[in-house]
């Protein structure tokens, strides 16, 4: 009777929706169903999965792989075709993409991927690809999400994911480490990383004498270019080639060592480098703002909080220390984000700093304009902090003040927005040397715009300044 009841409930439930980015592997696809993720497998995929199940369970126990279990048999009827097995996974709260990660975050993901490959290889398995999209973060801790890419290792097989690893991990890291160019816009524009062929065009002659650069990037790019230009390609040679297991392991270990040593030039001045220490606040004013945030979080107890303009994460940490379980910070300054990520690693707090240019947030894009979801589709929270944030859009980038307020209040149902008036030294610097065209930028206009989108619960003037903190609760 219980099984019959389950079947009736399943029949009445909405059908699972395929995750838009899950279309490349026909042997197993991913679906969103109610409060969980379902993963289907055909018979071949189910056999391979069963052979690796013990290893995968070990990875789950180590926190390196998203948990899995078999879905109840009644759920099989939701899918058409020859489905041999259906897994269920916990629903990840947020999905992030490599073009939103900091240099430090991308580096952590690359090292995580390589270590996973090495450990799998020791147990007779390997990863079938090397896409960065298979890594997600819980705080600053990376985890792997694609169970079906763990395959039995075949003796002598080539590393078919080498090019993908280089373009989705190594080249974006080198772009910053060698040229001090951030990867975010390039990666987002291409989606599959930064092409090696494009990166090679940036290299000078001296770079060609680097053995690692030549072997992993320059030579493969040149060979690829040569193959593409041929009218006839002989695939037999590549299929006959063998890569001994020791050589495979040595290649992974070399990449691990190389990437571990990649650094950015912290001596170069960034837009907000040292901002926390050199802004227009006094220590007393900063402490006052922190106390206000602490009281807000203690009162409302948001599980997840979003910190817009997080810099190195000071106020995210205030939130975490006063009852928030998880903080996601956003900023566009690469040095601040790297410092914030390193801080998260060192403290083991559930804080993930991500890249965001609020003028141009990550859009929905890729195949069907749905393969990778946009910012607003993926990021929402119980509360939002927008401290010293709105004037960077309204003054520095001419976004209408009312639209800035509307955008911030969509991120969470409650939060704190700081209004920074024209009399503030920071805004005066922004307006220096340019015409002040912002006749409607004032606190009255700000308060009016906020009251149209939310209820103003409280406001607090930071002592010794003209900045005001507004606590809001959105009108539903």
Swiss-Prot record:
Signal peptide: none
Keyword Zinc-finger: no
GO function terms (MF aspect): methyltransferase activity
One of the Pfam families matching this protein, by short name: FtsJ
Entry-linked InterPro entries: RNA_MeTrfase_FtsJ_dom, SAM-dependent_MTases_sf
A GO biological process held by the record: methylation
Keywords: Nodulation, Plasmid
Functional description taken from the UniProt entry: Not known; does not seem to participate in nod factor synthesis but required for nodulation on some specific Medicago species such as M.littoralis.
Protein name: Nodulation protein NoeA
UniProt organism field: Rhizobium meliloti (strain 1021) (Ensifer meliloti)
Lineage: Bacteria, Pseudomonadati, Pseudomonadota, Alphaproteobacteria, Hyphomicrobiales
